């Protein structure tokens, strides 16, 4: 009886392989990557979890905070909120939260969004006087029927939830703004001080993904300007069946391609996180060139993570880096870039 069972199993496996081979052969002309996945008969790889990724070198410190949650079996959602809050609280980080550079009117306006494993999302944009927009975004997600609040409405909601109203313009940021007023030249600088939006994505021990993204936006922007960071699908996107991605750099260029949604969809089609980030950047490069803009004045970087804990990153030009924390430790990595 045991021998017959083994023979039946072998026959079933052979039939399954032949079936896969036929489907994959037909798929090659349409999508080689999908065909490769169909032919893959190897055992599933061990998932690298928990793991957290974040943008730029200040991500190293943010990762440490996130890891305190993940290493104890905590949720990815709690980890990403705690991680980016650390950067929001730091007045020396001039592009996020307290101490962020103001707009051209001298007003510090903050953007943030958060997304969990169940497609729950919350976002705030152009919000003033609240140090931790990421936590307000989470409150929008958990305590309102909406997904985004902006401006005075976001502030009113934050105050109703017990958040403290504060002056976010530090003496150093105010001094720089007054110097800028002498010329009022507006030209965002690529990779300025290696600081920009902090985006963070994480996979917890339960295999669930979440992400967070927060920024004070471009320095000396027009009042009311909103970039990609608070926009789900642009600055951040999470699909718990596939993976997560977040972006940094010139938000207008990310918005044009709905960049992080594109990265996750490319992973859905079979690309690795690295391949997906590279292809998304290449699409932005193509669009920038088509619009006749100077690519040297533009930076966009993506980081991505899939359900296996595999990750990748890519950017337009040299200068971007990202932080990774997993069981191997916390480290800074430099991705490939398109503009050589």
Swiss-Prot record:
It is found in: Periplasm. The active site is at residue 197. Cleaved into an alpha and beta chain by autocatalysis; this activates the enzyme. The N-terminal residue of the beta subunit is responsible for the nucleophile hydrolase activity. GO terms for cellular component: cytoplasm; periplasmic space. Substrate binds at residues 225-228, 248-251. Belongs to the Ntn-hydrolase family. GO terms for molecular function: N4-(beta-N-acetylglucosaminyl)-L-asparaginase activity; peptidase activity. GO terms for biological process: proteolysis. Residues 1-45 form the signal peptide. InterPro entries: Ntn_hydrolases_N, Peptidase_T2, TAT_signal_bac_arc. Its main location: periplasm. NCBIfam families: TAT_signal_seq. Its EC number is 3.5.1.26. Cleaves the GlcNAc-Asn bond which joins oligosaccharides to the peptide of asparagine-linked glycoproteins. Requires that the glycosylated asparagine moiety is not substituted on its N-(R1) and C- (R2) terminus. CDD domains: Glycosylasparaginase. Disulfide bonds: none annotated. This is N(4)-(Beta-N-acetylglucosaminyl)-L-asparaginase. Keywords: Autocatalytic cleavage, Hydrolase, Periplasm, Protease, Signal.
């Amino acid at each position: 009886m045991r021998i017959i069972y083994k023979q039946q199993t072998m026959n079933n496996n052979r039939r399954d392989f032949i079936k896969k081979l036929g489907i994959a052969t037909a798929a090659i002309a349409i999508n080689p990557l999908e065909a490769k996945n169909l032919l893959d008969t190897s055992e599933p790889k061990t998932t690298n979890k928990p793991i957290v990724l974040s943008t730029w070198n200040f991500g190293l410190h943010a990762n440490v905070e996130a890891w305190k949650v993940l290493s104890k079996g905590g949720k990815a959602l709690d980890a990403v909120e705690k991680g980016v809050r650390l950067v929001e609280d730091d007045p020396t980080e001039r592009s996020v939260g307290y101490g962020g550079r103001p707009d051209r009117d001298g007003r510090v306006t903050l953007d943030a969004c958060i997304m969990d494993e169940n497609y729950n999302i919350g976002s705030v944009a152009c919000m003033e006087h609240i140090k931790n927009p990421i936590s307000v975004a989470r409150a929008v997600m958990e305590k309102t029927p909406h997904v985004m609040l902006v401006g005075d409405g976001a502030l009113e909601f934050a105050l109703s939830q017990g958040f403290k109203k504060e002056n976010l313009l530090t003496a150093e940021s105010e001094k720089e703004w007054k110097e800028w007023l002498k010329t009022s030249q507006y030209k965002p600088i690529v990779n300025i001080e290696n600081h920009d939006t902090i985006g963070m994505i994480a996979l917890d021990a339960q295999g669930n993904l979440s992400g967070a993204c927060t920024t004070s936006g471009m320095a000396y922007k027009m009042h009311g300007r909103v970039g990609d960071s608070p926009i789900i699908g642009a600055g951040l996107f999470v699909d718990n069946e596939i993976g997560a991605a977040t972006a940094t750099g010139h938000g207008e260029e990310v918005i044009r391609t709905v960049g992080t949604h594109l990265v996750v969809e490319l992973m859905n089609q079979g690309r690795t996180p690295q391949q997906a980030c590279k292809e998304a950047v290449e699409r932005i490069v193509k669009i920038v060139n088509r619009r006749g803009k100077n690519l040297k004045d533009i930076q966009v970087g993506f980081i991505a993570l899939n359900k296996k804990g595999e990750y990748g990153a890519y950017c337009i030009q040299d200068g971007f880096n990202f932080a990774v924390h997993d069981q191997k430790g916390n480290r800074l990595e430099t991705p490939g870039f398109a503009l050589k």
